[in-house]
Amino acid sequence: MSAPTTTKASASSSPPALRPLSSSLLLTIPTTNAQLVLPSVTVPAARRHNSTKSTNSTTSTNSTTATSKMPIERRAAEIEKRIAAIPLERYRNFCIVAHIDHGKSTLSDRLLEHTGTIVAGDGNKQVLDKLDVERERGITVKAQTCTMIYKHKEDGLDYLLHLVDTPGHVDFRAEVTRSYSSCSGALLLVDASQGVQAQTVANFYLAFAQGLSLVPVVNKIDMASADVPRVLEQLETVFELDTSTAVKVSAKTGQGVGEILPAVIKKMPAPVGDAKKPLRMLLVDSWYDTFKGVVLLVRLFDGTLKQGDKVYSYATGNEYIVGEVGIQYPDAVPQKVLRAGQVGYVFFNPGMKRIQDAKLGDTFTNVGYEDIVEPCPGFEEPKPMVFVAAFPTNQDDYGRLADSISHLVLNDRSVTLQKDYSEALGAGWRLGFLGSLHCSVFQDRLRQEHGASIIITEPAVPTKIVWSTGQEEIVTNPAEFPDPDDHRIRSATLYEPFVNATVTLPEEYVGRCIEICENARGVQKSLEFFTATQVILKYELPAASLVDDLFGKLKGATKGYATLDYEDAGWRQAQLVKLNLLVNKKAVDAVARIVHTSQVERLGRQWVTKFKEHVDRQMFEVIIQAAAGRRIVARETIKPFRKDVLAKLHASDITRRRKLLEKQKAGRKRLRAVGNVIIDQSAFQKFLSK
């Protein structure tokens, strides 16, 4: 591979094959607590954390304060006036990519302050992260965009910058991939204390495959554990990047941040486009607004877009009239026109009512030019990798919970939804997610934004069945997996999804991590030392191992130093069986799982032991079993309450004693045959919790 320097990668380069991903979490964009200002009056806005001062942290002459009180219309007009004076060659569209928790959102805050887009202050934390769950967890779930106007300190000219803050977790890589379509360059951010990690590697190759210009940035240089020379060596060794121009910053204190934007302007190309040509507009993202309908985030390659224009959708064939256009600054600011090279928002009048009509990767053009303008390459729809069933804790809350789930799914097209029913838990839904964290975030959002309490079953991966006739079937619900009595399953071939996993870790933990991967039925592909003490392990692993807390086991074995990244590797033939939990020989359908035959006995013993702890004693004996097909692999028994039927008898009446005991035994047997085991919903909640 001929790795890129900080200039644009050539088309002849041959990056590794990557799985294309696409749309991911979508959401409405509420107002942030950041103060929106105009870049007009100049004041210093350097960060002053802990009295840290640096000549590098001096801000651009764009910073402002008093204009925050300016009326919205005048504020928008001032911004539009400055943008109109900036030619296309002074546009720069770029994103920040890095491993999770390397400081992307904090650096975004400093850049917004440095350009005067928001007023500098200690309250600016994760300004572009709109969700409560993002702020609580300290992660970015949804890629966020912002337009900035920057006055270059060398030539004194205005530059129009479009920034995308991308997620770092592997579950949301589709957000990163889609963000690249609106960018011509990327800041490759690396933590000075952690160094290159798994998703740093993955994001580099994604950017390399897209031909983006890369600017390496080393963050957190103010930390006591920072080792900048080691990180620069890793960037040179692993990526063959020229680190002589790497920018060293502390996003927390603002040190060195002033050097980033000049590097962006110098090393990243301007977007290519022509405002005089017919409209050619790519749909990058969308979200639903109660009053406006579907709002589109778009990138204009050619032409202009303004209120009243009639546009045509290549994906649906529908025509729309533009109601409003604008930019994110960082909140929505209406504009009269969007030009080629810009990224902004648009909604229609009458509004687009169905989020399904906004197909990510769709191309729009002016009505009448649909046969002339060539559509942009689209995105591949993301494939859910993890499926769960969700049920209300109280069936009386079904309607309210249905509305809450529908509202979230409306703004998160990567979630698949269908109705489900369980004899044990009642009516519910079957949900598909991009990964375990995606599922967890969805559940947190449901509880925070709608106050919903739900029971969510253990995550499961899909299974492919190839029948003897050659017909294929994908099973996402274990309850729908054929019973062993079905003669067709005996001649069918079963497949499970696999992933190509990349694990980075310190050298001293290699042995333990290899053992964990081998126990997870992994196949080692390579082991590389990218520094004297850091190792990259590449394994082919079943996707089921990822939902079985493989990452948690790796983190535990390496004292938190291991990092994991993965991508789809297709289907592999496997020996699979459905594991059922039986209560008095009756299957609890909501708990069923499809597992590999090597895991049946271990998982079965765990099930019966844990479930016994949460089931109350009954008036009759309760037998809890784990069954793989027709074979019982584990059993626990809950003894019944015992009534002392001998209390009124004399000790010498042995015949009467025996008769009463036999009668009690027969009664219990009859009760067990006709009685229903009463299992409280809280028992399922506790059993299904980690």
Swiss-Prot record:
Gene encoding this polypeptide? GUF1
Q: How does it sit in the membrane?
A: Peripheral membrane protein
Question: According to the UniProt entry, which residue ranges have a biased composition of type Low complexity?
Answer: 52-68
TM region positions? none
Please give the function described in this protein's UniProt entry. Answer: Promotes mitochondrial protein synthesis. May act as a fidelity factor of the translation reaction, by catalyzing a one-codon backward translocation of tRNAs on improperly translocated ribosomes. Binds to mitochondrial ribosomes in a GTP-dependent manner.
Residue span of region Disordered: 40-68
GO CC annotation, single:
mitochondrial matrix
Q: Which protein is depicted?
A: Translation factor GUF1, mitochondrial
Q: Which PANTHER family match?
A: TRANSLATION FACTOR GUF1, MITOCHONDRIAL, TRANSLATION FACTOR GUF1-RELATED
